[in-house]
UniProtKB/Swiss-Prot annotation:
The lineage of its organism: Bacteria, Bacillati, Bacillota, Bacilli, Bacillales. Pfam families: PrmA. This is Ribosomal protein L11 methyltransferase. Its EC number is 2.1.1.-. PANTHER family: ELECTRON TRANSFER FLAVOPROTEIN BETA SUBUNIT LYSINE METHYLTRANSFERASE. One of its GO terms (biological process) is methylation.
Length: 312
């Protein structure tokens, strides 16, 4: 199987909406190459730690690289994406450029590694690729060593970052945690680094479970995290203090009632993967079953909600 890399050079004002369009149409990740990064210090408040190469960036504007399965990326999808992008009010149509190339599966398996470097994902957590070395910058820094494989997120998506921030705030060592749709296992590992002793990681995809187990081994917690295939919380009988779910909004909506029933009194439901257009519906459903919304984060068109199970 091959992949189509759709490359688009656009103005800065259109980046957020264009990225959402690409992701909503099934892109398996979007790489953002911003010409401003060559001018400004490559360091944000969490500290990026890698050198930038001029040849990787456009002369002006922003290059977005989106990756689509060649079998599903046809003329209709190509035109639909182009039409939606060209209809954006924020887009400077005089300076937009489109190009495509085919990337072989063997190349794709390693191509994404060129864009994955150690980075601070939140106040405490730093994500470190398994093939790179990294020295902690502070004693309180918690490092997650990750080899997500090409099918799973690297931790730099806004939804993951927001979940990590919520874990920092609400998860305590004495809590028990269930991570639904664990993927690479990053949120389970974060809970372990906080000091949690009882963690269960579920994913309907057995490949995800395998990847997660390998990442648990890399972080020396494979014996402390139970990683198993599972269909959301439908068959879960054990109670937990924390339910974490960073998955798509329609799946979150399907599991809200089960999340409430799985939680101990006073427990927290940390959930993201919600686009801003759908978060009010998710929030209303959570409140309807008995959750009190105690935290709401927004980042680049995505939302993370934390609901607490409270007494009537």
């Amino acid at each position: 199987m091959n992949w189509t890399e759709l490359s688009i050079i656009i103005n800065h004002e259109a980046v957020e909406l264009a990225t959402n369009i690409l992701e909503n149409h099934g892109s398996n990740g979007v790489v953002i190459e911003d010409s401003y990064d060559l001018i400004n210090q490559p360091e944000d408040k969490y500290g990026e730690i890698y050198a930038l190469k001029k040849e990787d960036y456009p002369d002006k504007g922003v290059r977005l690289k989106a990756y689509f399965n060649e079998l599903t990326y046809d003329d209709k999808l190509r035109q639909r994406i182009k039409d939606e992008l060209l209809n954006l009010d924020e887009l400077d149509q005089h300076n937009v450029q489109f190009s495509e190339q085919i990337i072989a599966e063997t190349d794709w398996e390693n191509e994404w590694k060129n864009y994955f470097h150690p980075f601070r994902a939140s106040k405490k957590f730093t994500i470190v690729p398994s093939w790179e070395t990294y020295a902690k910058e502070a004693d309180e820094e918690l490092c997650i060593e990750l080899d997500p494989g090409m099918a799973f997120g690297t931790g730099d998506h806004p939804t993951t970052s927001m979940c990590l921030k919520a874990i920092e705030t609400y998860v305590l060592p004495q809590h028990s945690v269930i991570d639904v749709g664990t993927g690479s296992g990053i949120l389970s590992i974060a809970s372990y680094l906080i000091g949690v002793k009882r963690i269960k990681a579920l994913d309907i995809d057995e490949m995800a479970v395998s990847v997660a187990k390998e990442n648990f081994r890399r972080n020396h917690c494979e014996t402390l995290i139970e990683a198993v295939p599972g269909n959301l919380l439908k068959d879960e009988t054990e109670k937990f203090d924390i339910v974490i779910a960073n998955i798509l909004a329609h799946i979150i909506d399907e599991m809200i009632d089960d999340a409430y029933n799985t939680l101990n009194e006073g427990g927290y439901f940390i959930t993201s993967g919600i686009i801003k257009e759908k978060y009010e519906g998710i929030q209303s459903h959570m409140e309807r079953v008995g959750f009190k919304i105690i935290s709401e984060q927004h980042d680049n068109g995505w939302v993370c909600l934390v609901g607490q199970k409270v007494s009537e």
